[in-house]
Amino acid sequence: MADPEATKYPLLKLLTYRQTTITDHHKQRPNDDDLQTPQTPPSPLQSCSVQTPPWTIEQHVLQLTAQTSSGLCVVLTLHL
């Protein structure tokens, strides 16, 4: 019988578990200056749109949207 989680979330199969040590983590970490992106001004607080899916992918951008229990809309944008 197939794993229901694998059927429901097929991308989870792409993730693998890898145990790292603290020294490995620090060796692989790129320079913070390389990771910084231009700052955008904060937008006014608004609730998440009910019509917005929890994640979207457009070209090289993955955008995750969630709403906290207090009603704050959190949007995480990853540039791939």
Swiss-Prot record:
The places in or outside the cell where this protein is found are: Host cytoplasm; Host nucleus
Provide ranges: composition bias, Basic and acidic residues.
Answer: 23-32
Q: Where is this region: Disordered?
A: 22-50
Give the record's PTM text.
Phosphorylated by host ERK. The phosphorylation triggers a structural change that enhances keratin binding and protein stability.
Write out the GO cellular component annotations: host cell cytoplasm; host cell nucleus
User: Which Pfam families does its entry note?
Assistant: Pap_E4 (PF02711)
Q: Would the keyword Phosphoprotein be found if you checked this record's keyword annotation?
A: yes
The main location class comes to: host cell
Superkingdom classification of source: Viruses
- Keyword line: Early protein, Host cytoplasm, Host G2/M cell cycle arrest by virus, Host nucleus, Host-virus interaction, Modulation of host cell cycle by virus, Phosphoprotein
Is Transferase one of the keywords UniProt gives this record? no
Could you state one GO biological process linked to this protein? symbiont-mediated arrest of host cell cycle during G2/M transition
Coiled-coil ranges from the UniProt annotation = none
Q: InterPro entries annotated for this entry?
A: Papilloma_E4 (IPR003861)
Quaternary context: Assembles into oligomeric complexes. Interacts with host CDK1. Interacts with host SRPK1; this interaction may favor expression of late viral transcripts. Interacts with host cytokeratin components KRT8 and KRT18.
* Task performed by this protein: Contributes to multiple aspects of the viral life cycle including viral genome amplification, suppression of suprabasal cell differentiation and egress of newly formed virions. Induces host cell cycle arrest at the G2 phase by associating with and preventing the nuclear entry of host CDK1/cyclin B1 complexes. Inhibits cellular DNA replication by preventing loading of host replication licensing proteins MCM2 and MCM7 onto chromatin. Within the cytoplasm, associates with host kinase SRPK1, a splicing factor regulator, and inhibits its activity.
A further note on this protein reads: The major E4 form is first synthesized as an E1^E4 fusion protein from spliced E1^E4 transcripts, such that the first few amino acids of the E4 protein are derived from the N terminus of E1.
Of which family is this protein a member? Belongs to the papillomaviridae E4 protein family.
The name under which this protein is listed is Protein E4
Organism, scientific name: Human papillomavirus 33
Underlying gene: E4
